[in-house]
Amino acid sequence: MEHLRHSDPEGESPPPPIEWLKVGTTVADLTNQLSARNDIIALVGPDAAHGAPACFFPHHSEVELNTNTAFGPRTAPEDVGDLTDPKRQYEFPRAVGLIAHEAFHARYSRWSASETADQLNAEEFKAFELLEESRIEYQGLQDVPRVREFIRSAVIDINLEHRPEMEHTEAAFQVFGLINARVQAGTLEEREVEDVVGQVTDFLGAELSLHLSGIVSTFHESRDLSERHQLAREWVAAKHEAADQRGEKPDGGFDPAALAQAVKNALEDIILTASIALADQESDEVAEAFVLDVQQKTKQRKRNEQEAEKLF
C-alpha cells in the first residue's frame, strides 16, 4: 500500500458518500494549508484510499482519506467539524497526522515519476520512494513543527504499510529506511526505538550503518532530484554488497519477524507518548490564546481610555 501514487489503481475510487462531502471540503482545506497550495481536492469516505489509510495522487492533485481508519468506523460525519480549527484537530489527531503526511507529499514530492522511472531501475525506484517518506517529514517538520505529534499519532498507519516481510539484509535495509531515517528526520526519537535501531545496527555493522545514515542525511537535505536519484542507487548498491558479504540467511540470530514485531511494539508506545504530548500541547495553546486575548483586550481598553480623554 502506497501513500504517493503516480498512477491510477485498478478500479476507480467509489464516489464519496454524500454525508462525507462536507468533511472532504475541510480535509482539502487543511491539506492545502499544510502543503502551501490551493489546488488540492479531497476524496473522503469509508472506501477511499484503495486499502491505505490515506494517499496522494500528484497528477490529480487529490488526497484520499479512509474515514474508518482516520476517524474510526463509529464516527459520524457531523461529529468531525472544521479540521482547520486547531481545537478540532485535537479531537482527531490520527486523522490530522495522516493528512499532514499526505500534505507534505503534496508540498515536497514535486518530482516527475516518469523521469525518475527513466533514471532508476525498479529496485532503485523503490529505494527512492522509501527515502522520500522520511524526507518529506524532515522538510515538513522544519516548516510546520506544530504537527509533529499529530504525525506521531498516526505513525503505525504511516510506517506499517511497508511492513518488512522479507529476509535478513532486505529487512534490515527496509527498517533502516522506515525507522532509523525517521529518527534522523526528527519524527521519532532514538530512545523510543532503541531496540529496533540496535538490532539493525548489530546486523549491518557500525560502518555500514554510518554509511546509510550519511545517505539518509544527504537525501533529506537535498533539493536536487538528480542527486537523490544517485543516492537511491548508492542505497541499493550498498544493500547488494551487504547481501553478498553476509548471505541472505547468515548466522547470528537476526530474525526479520522479530524485528517487525519490535517495530510494531515501539510504534504503539510512540502513539501513547504522542497522545500525552498532544494534551500538553493543547493546554499550552489554550493558555497562549488566553494570554493573547487578555493582551488584546487590555490594548483595546487603553485605546478606549485615550479616546475618552480626547473627548473630555
Model-derived features: positions:
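Basic/hydrophobic alpha-helical interface regions
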Residues: M1-H168, A172-E190, T201-G205
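Negatively charged
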Residues: I179-F312
